[in-house]
């Protein structure tokens, strides 16, 4: 089952979304327009960007959404 969670700023504006697969624990980060920003693979314990480049060890999908919003402003 896929769980979709909106990521909001302090004022309640939706910045993006994170989809989590209940079975595998993998996550996909989307911006407000549903463009894929990156993916977290639980088995590898790493977060990759849209192009597949490793960004960090651990789950930093929420940071991808926030960083994209910061660049837009």
Predicted regions and their residues:
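Intrinsically disordered, low-complexity proline/glycine-rich segments
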Residues: 1-73
